[in-house]
Each structure stands twice: as C-alpha cells, then as structure tokens.
Amino acid sequence: MPTVKFHSLLTDFDVALYQAGKHFQLHHKMGSHVVEVDGQKGVCFSVWAPNAKRVSVTGDFNGWNPDAHILNPRWDSSGIWEGFIPGIGKGTVYKYHVKTIDGFGLDKGDPFAKLWETPPKTASVVWEFDYGWKDDQWIKARRESAFQPKPWSVYEVHPGSWKKIPKDGNRSLNFREMADELVPYVKEMGFTHVELMPVMEHPYFPSWGYQVTGYFAPTSRSGQPEDLMHFIDTCHEAGIGVLLDWVPSHFPGDMHGLYLFDGTHIYEYGDMRRGFHPDWNSYVFDYGRNEVRSFLISNALFWLELYHVDGLRVDAVASMLYHDYSRKEGEWIPNIYGGRENLEAISFLKDFNEAVSKEFPGVETIAEESTAFPAVTHPTFEGGLGFGQKWMMGWMHDSLSYFKRPPIFRRWHQNEITFSMVYAFSEKYMLPLSHDEVVHMKSSLLNKMPGDEWQKFANLRALFGHQWTHPGSQILFMGGELGQTSEWSHDLGVAWHLLEFEYHRGVQTWVKDLNHLYSSRKAMWYNAFSPKGYEWISGDDTENCVLAYLRKGEADDKVLLVICHFNTNMMAQYTVGVPYGGTWTEVLNSDDKKYGGSGIVNGALKANKEPSHGREHSITFQLPPLCLLVFEGENLPKTTKGNAKAEKEKTEQKTEKKAATHKASRAKKS
C-alpha cells in the first residue's frame, strides 16, 4: 500500500497564529505545495478538518482510492491533517476524502487550491506559479502615493460576458484575450480602474462568481493563474488599476466546497439562524472562529501579494453586519448584548482592513454596504471599520428614482437629487451604477429614462454627468457607457453592435470625455471626499429643475462650475452667480452634437459684474434641455491668491500664539 511520509510546512508558531485568528499567510503553508523531501520530489498536503475521523488524498495518481494515501493528524490537536506524497507534482488532480465521525465519506476540494478543474468538474489541481512580473514601477508608485488623493473612475466588468465570440460557440474571452482587448478599451475610455466581478472559482456560472468554492483560485473557465497575472500586469503597464470583487459574506452549499467540510459546521455558523443566508440559499462564515478568520484574511492578502491586485471590493457587507439581515422576528439570534449587530463580523472586518493597510499600503478596500452603519470608512483607531471607500447606495437609489420620473413631475422631487449632499462627506463614497441596477427585470439604464428616444439619451447623458461631477468617486457597469438597450445577460454579453448607431456612439463619447475631464482636472477628484471640494451656487430652482455648484481642487487649481438642467425646456438666457470675474469657458456640454445632442453650446463667456445667487459676478448662457454643462474659470486673480495666502499666514500666526499662550499657562499652573 502506498504510504504518506510525515512532513509539515507548519511550525508550532504557525499553528498558534492560525488558532489565534492571526495567521494571514496561510497560503504559503496550507493546501498543496510542490517540495523536495530527502531527495524525493513530491507534494506536501495540509488541510484543516478537526472533526474528521480520517483524511486521505485521492486523485488520478492513485485511481481515486481513499485508502491509498492517508494523511497524518498533527499531534497538537489542531485538527490539521498533513503529509508528503512522493512522485507527483504540478498538474496533479486531487481531492480530500474525508471520513466523518459518523462514518460517511465526503470528497472535498482543497480550500487552499490555487487551481481547480474547469466546471462542472470539481477536483483541485496542484499548482505552482511561474510568472515574471513587470510592474515594479507601478507597485512602487502605488506604495509611495498611499493615502494621497487620486482619481477613481471605475469600469465594472463581468469577465465571462464583456465580449463573446459568436464564431466560436459564443464563448467568453479568456484572461489573455481580455488583456489584448479590454485593457486598450478601458485605456481609451479614460477609466482609471477596472473592477472584475468575482474571478474566484465558482461552479455555477449564472451566480456571476458570487458563489465561490475555490477562494484561492481564478476560475479555470478563463485560463490558468498566470493568464490572470498577465491581464493584471498588462493593466498596470497601461496605467490602469485592478480591483477584484471579494466575497467573505457567504459561500454555497456545493458538497465539494466548504459546507460541512469535515461532516460538521467548521467554516459556517452551526446554528442556521446565523449560518444560513435566506437570500442566496448559501452559508455564512463563522466570523467568531479564529481558524476561519485566518483563512479569510489570508485569502485577501493572497490576491494582493501574488496577483498584485490594487483593491478589493467587499461584497454584501450589510449582510455581514447584522444578524437580522433578511430575517424575520424569531429567525435570528441577538448578540451577547441583545443587539442585532454581528460583533464578530465587525471585529473581523476591522482586522481585515488593518491587515491590508499594514501589509499593502496604497491598496484600497471598498465596502458594498447599503445601510446607515456608522464610520464604515473611518480608521479603526477612531472606531471605524477601516474601509477606504463605501458604495453610496442612497445616491444611486434617489438618483434613479428622480431620473425615472417624467421631467414635468421632477420639480416636486428636487430633494431626491439634492439630498445626497446632506451626508456626502460623512463617509468616503463611491457612486455606483453597477450590475445590480440592470438585471432582474429592472431594465437597462437607458430604458429607465422617460421620454422619446432623444430624451432618453439626453437623460442618460445628464445622469452620467451628474454622477461624474458629484463628490466622491464613481463606478459604471459595462454596457452602460454605450447606452445598452437591454438588461445585462451573462449569456449574451455587451451589445457592441449598438455602436453602429449615432446616439449610442454619442453616449460612449460622452463617458470618454467625462473621464478625460475628470482625470485632467484636480477640481474633480482632489477633494472628492472633503467639503472643501464642493460649493453650492443654487439648488432651489425647482421650477426649471436646475442645479449649479462648484468643484474645487487645491488653492491654485482652476475652479469648475457645473450646471445640471433636468427639464425639457430650452432657456436662451440663464444666469448664475460665479465666485469671481474673468472668463468662464465651457469645457463640457452634454448637448453637443458629437454626443447626440441638439448642438446648443456656449464657448467662452466673460463674467458680468451683475450680482446673482449671493455672488458679485455672474455669467449668462444658453441652457439646453436635459443637459449638464461644465465651465472652467480662469485661475484666481493674483490679488485673491495673495489675500488667501495672507489670510492663511494670519491664521497660522494666531494658532501659534494661542498654542504658546496655552503652554505658558500650563507652565504657570505647574
């Protein structure tokens, strides 16, 4: 009978950290690793199954015989089974055969596998990475610019349906083909980042990747691990950051996955009032179990370390934070204080964000969090969860509600489009128009818009303009940028043929120009999360559905004036106040003919010394229907700059004097 040699990659300290929930490098120790022991090449296996009666490795190398290669339980009662099997290596297909305490046999994939068979096959594959990265300068610059303001315009992509190949059975692009086609497109469109919906291995394609079984493996539907590395490397070479959707909120009940891994609930909560997710018929991680915390945070750092990912967007955070999420009374258990907050999940998220910030400065974590849970993007040392950004679901809901209304009724709902400014700076917000808004009979963004064909496109351009010029960053799901007419389908992909039509090309050009204006003007992004970057001119012209506001960068940056007009009336002369005189040049106008508009544009305007909206100067311009205009002011006059500098110096002197007085007072008391 073949034997398994005793060999371990784990030290006693590793095990202690693992059991304390503080081992965040488990991917280097657990799972399968090609090694050499006593001159023999083979594979070392290590798996956590604390309640198993026996664990063996089965595979194509032993005819899937569960009695052939039985692993050794560690002496320390850690629940880890391990051993070395000589004569096998990279590419070996395997599973763990787990005999439960009840005598049943379960065939499980490796939770730490770096590659899996292509679904519907479910076995793991021994893999060692072989890729030479070329993004040293990108990583260095990312680290050095950590915590500095930067532009964030994100293109959300479902890798399996961004583009299909009809001539080849309507198959999806693989990762290398995406590097050749998606990266140049994102670069041309001016997006700063691409966010991939989950690339981790998942058995059910229509889950879009959110039902993960292989947390440490990119889906083999799209190629090998090195192919994804090549895609990310190509993005970095093009100056594009890469974000991955990460799903620590739940996992599916597929029997080759984490559910009942050793016949008991070790990865999920044992009580289904906490452990079962009613929305997705999936299972909730036990965030109070230290081994699970080590597993999840190791997984997050794995993608950052070995795949050079620039950020993780954490899915369904709200479902993690509350025990009663989507549960009726009597279907959930309160925490130890009688509340509904999941204290273990809150603690886990803080640990996760601290680990990312410490190990990978410059990497962003983004929360999809739909409730009013406080301080999601505040530092953990201030009591926050520590995320870098949070999706602004309130803006999305209110804005879509507003834009769905026929313009004639919008005058009575101005609050829907302005309310977001009440709380815009309470968190660091990312404004989402994501995949969730264009599925499940919600219709496409274009078909949410009211009116005839021209009005639908004009409304859509105005919506995008408002999203881009609103404080915060923005994310747009693929297809939205060309005004897709149908809902997104993972089987059909983006309707690229629509670019044959003028209006659709116009929307695409509009998004491209929005991105280029956004990235090139610090006023659009430098103070994206600070009230310093935004100033109301007017928000109360409800009759005409007009908003006017300023976007501001640093002191020496040119100021942008944004005019939103969400009604169908054309006004030959509309006046708004401006903060100073000089020339105000129209740098963007969604009614330009190249975007599919009617062609009412303004060019450069000289400010008048006519007071308006509490300002000493004003400009008067043509205001097209259903549009967004952006004017750029001249640099602040030298006298204004000088006054600002003098005022700053005066304030600093006062502060220093006050501090000295306070210090002297304390010295006198002592």
Residue ranges and their predicted role:
Residues 1-44, 74-156, 161-170, 177, ...:
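The feature marks proteins involved in alpha-glucan
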Residues 47, 96, 157, 186, ...:
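Conserved, mostly hydrophobic/aromatic
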Residues 48-55, 579-582:
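Short proline/glycine-enriched turn/loop motifs at strand-loop junctions of beta-rich domains
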Residues 61-80, 591-614:
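Solvent-exposed beta-strand/loop surfaces of large extracellular or lumenal domains
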Residues 90-94, 603-642:
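C-terminal beta-strand-rich structural cap/linker in extracellular carbohydrate-active enzymes
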Residues 117, 138-152, 158-341, 621, ...:
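Substrate-binding/active-site clefts of carbohydrate-active enzymes
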Residues 120, 308-310, 325-493, 498, ...:
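Conserved alpha/beta catalytic core and glycan-binding cleft of carbohydrate-active enzymes
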Residues 639-670:
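Intrinsically disordered, polybasic Lys/Arg-rich low-complexity tracts
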